[in-house]
């Protein structure tokens, strides 16, 4: 199975619904590094629907920022604990006076630009249809976050959603 032409890696959207949102809405498709919701399993039910779109948006923005800064995804935990580091690093390197909110908007704009390219190229995304119907053992879960709910990822204020 694939999303936007990219094969689904180890994380099944039926058991980690936040990663399913990322696969469907990320400009890169089924790329777990685009916004891996695995770490959210400590703070929210990974098989639940509530909050998954918002969590995916936060993680995708942080992933886009790390990619844009040219740093490895493995340093993300430090940024999750102290997200102001994004602005501090850019300010130190380039002599800017960016706030964390400025940087969040930059990450969001990056994702929206990539998604606009996909739309113009005819690339659309959703999890494979069978994942919405076929239950995954042992919890017998399906991916039940609607396309309409996932589309909200593009209208949620990225700055307000980060805290």
Give the residues covered by each predicted segment:
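Extended C-terminal regions of large enzymes
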Residues: 1-163
């Amino acid at each position: 199975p694939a999303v936007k032409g990219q094969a689904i890696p180890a994380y099944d959207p039926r058991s980690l619904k936040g990663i399913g949102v990322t696969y469907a809405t990320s400009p890169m498709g089924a790329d777990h590094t685009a916004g891996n919701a695995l770490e959210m399993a400590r703070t929210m039910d990974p098989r639940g629907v509530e909050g998954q779109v918002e969590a995916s948006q936060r993680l995708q923005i942080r992933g886009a920022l790390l990619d844009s800064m040219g740093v490895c995804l493995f340093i993300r935990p430090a940024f999750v604990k102290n997200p102001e580091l994004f602005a501090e690093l850019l300010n130190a390197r380039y002599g800017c006076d960016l706030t964390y909110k400025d940087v969040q908007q930059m990450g969001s704009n990056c994702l929206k630009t990539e998604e606009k390219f996909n739309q113009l190229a005819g690339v659309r995304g959703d999890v494979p249809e069978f994942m919405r119907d076929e239950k995954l053992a042992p919890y017998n879960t399906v991916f039940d976050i609607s396309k309409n709910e996932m589309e909200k990822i593009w209208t949620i204020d990225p700055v307000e959603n980060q805290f």
